[in-house]
Amino acid sequence: MMVVATTKILTAAEYLQREEQATEKSEFIQGEIIPIAGASANHNRLTFNLSRLLPLEIGDRQYEIFVSDMRLWIAESESYFYPDVMVIAEEPKFTDNSQMAVTNPSLIAEVLSTSAAGFDKNQKFGFYRTIPKLQEYLLIDQFCYRVEHYQKVGDRQWLLTELMGENAEIEFSFMKI
């Protein structure tokens, strides 16, 4: 269950100003600030290992990979998130010259925690699905060998492939390996 830290509706500019001074990260969802809990060691291992396994270049195509500290701006819902891993299959589109938030990931991966698993699977994925460039969404279980891999197959259509076991392999549609 997510805990809302403030009840006052803020603007995105007010959130960014607060975030500059904050000692801990928080997400901004339609005017509300949501604190992000600290990540476990296993959560950090999974995030690091996934980002390390993703290629930065395939043929003549380059990819940008961002881990945990890069904000994602979703204009349609006026929300900022901190996905665990984002892959951008073209030039990153930043919200401004500070290059602190991107808008065009092709892949987003979230390592599930006990406290936020339901939110990541439902509400957050609902926000993410409005990103025009998003093609794939991974939900990684940190307690067992299980990954939910969502692939965009059409306008408002997503295909779920459930991967289980330590030898399961993922094929990404946006990344031709």
Swiss-Prot record:
Stated name of the protein: Uncharacterized protein sll1609
Stored InterPro entries: Nuclease_put_TT1808 (IPR012296), Restrct_endonuc-II-like (IPR011335), Uma2 (IPR008538)
| Family, similarity comment | To Synechocystis PCC 6803 slr1290 and sll0925.
